[in-house]
Amino acid sequence: MPILAFTVSSCEMNLVPDGSIPEKEALRTVKDCDAWVLGIYSAFKNDALYSGSMALLQDIQADMAYAALKTNSGIYTQFYQWNIKSTTSEIANVYNGLYMIVSRCNFFFDYKDQVEATLKTTADKDDFKKRVGEVYFARALAFSELIRIFCEPMTTANANTENMGICLAMTYSDDVPMVKRSTLLESYNQVLSDLKQAEENIPAARTVADNPYFSLGAVYALQARVYLNMGMGDLSIKKDNEYLKKSVEAAGKVIKTGAYTLSDAVNNAFQVGSTQYTDYQMMWKYDQSDEIIWKIAMTPVSYGGTLGRYLLGYNTVAYSPQYHFSEAILSLYDDNDRRASVFCNQLEDAYGDQVYIITKYPGNPDLDGGATPKFINMPKPFRLSEVYLNRAEAYYWLGDDENAQKDLSSLKRKRITGFGSVSASGDDLLKEIKNERARELYMEGFRLSDLKRWHDPVKREKQLYSIDGSINNELNVKYTDAKYRFTTWPI
């Protein structure tokens, strides 16, 4: 498919190089649409996004990982030490990567009518309708991530403040730097509008587990996430909060589809060769599980970033990790919590020290061919566990401790051997919700934005074999500190 950059102006786009496809000719048939939408899916493989920077750097900037004393070579140091600005290459790459997806979606919308006018058969019309829904979802997801990472949390006070939202580029010819920033409410409303269109166009038959394609389950999961972020910003319990009620409703739709089940981390269910695996282990090693709502499909010859490369630093001889697992986070796991051994192992590094290695992304053997492992795993941007966590938190802010406890208990029973039920209430319940998000969503890119929306400090506690200092393993950035502004990445 032709690659069309979003940064060019409308005048520049009129200059067509010899031998290239004129812009208006790129989308003429259903087959053209199929190819274009596959290109949008492919854009999500970008190693600046879910398979790289966007997933790892928010957690590294927070408190999930510690720079290794002897094996860190300066990788991601700007983020770890909070020395970032809008021109920091990784930030620019995330921003541009998300807007590239928006741009590809907008190009489709600009020219979809000329395709629709040619449709004759029911099959072609159904296929086109499905593609329209997929593109609306892709744009909604990209916009939502831009809001989460590059904007302040929405509150009653700032919802309609000018220039606090994102640039809502709505046509391909829009030059993003020239588009005025919207309000936060306008930004979120555009996401919800796109999700409504996605819901109306994506077929129900797409709602299956372990899916590399967008589905109604993914639509509802994103709605639940977005409504939670819209509704909890005031950090006050309000039983009549409509955003939070809609978050609960959307999460319930995901669960009620019956298509997805929480992965079992307790009982062995699979055997590969001579090795027994739980469903949870299979999800993180082989990228397969009925808990997965949407994963980014990869092959040995078509993949994005390598999530485990710098975390493991393994060269078939020794481990030289750039970062170690945070001992403070590790202490949050119960002794019977089976996630801990999936995400972390104490191993000997290249210097003979016993260090906590981050093993969440060990590399899928079906993707990691060759003598030297690449540590490729398929990102899983939507899982059922996050849906339960979002609903539990929405229930908490609605003042419904009982249902929040039920959702947390449902998740924890699948993760912890012999777990009974959550009994915490009030502030203790909120603390447990926060801790459970840290345990379950470790190194998936949620931590910094979670701390930001809760106004919680970003605090690291000194640990062995990590680089010392107030900007390293003793970092403590409070909500009232000027430095806290960097929990929102600068544009």
What is each stretch, according to the model?
Residues 11-61, 251, 298, 305-319, ...:
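Membrane-proximal, proline-rich intrinsically disordered regions
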Residues 37, 102-105, 144, 188, ...:
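Inward-facing hydrophobic residues that define packing positions of alpha-helical scaffold repeats
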Residues 51-68, 122, 151-162, 166, ...:
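Short, surface-exposed recognition loops and adjoining beta-strand edges that mediate ligand/DNA contacts
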Residues 74-150, 182-185, 197-207, 372-379, ...:
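Conserved, well-structured interaction surfaces
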Residues 132, 139, 146, 223, ...:
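Structural register within alpha-helical repeat arrays
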Residues 176, 182-186, 241-252, 256-372, ...:
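Extended ligand-binding clefts on enzyme/binding-domain cores
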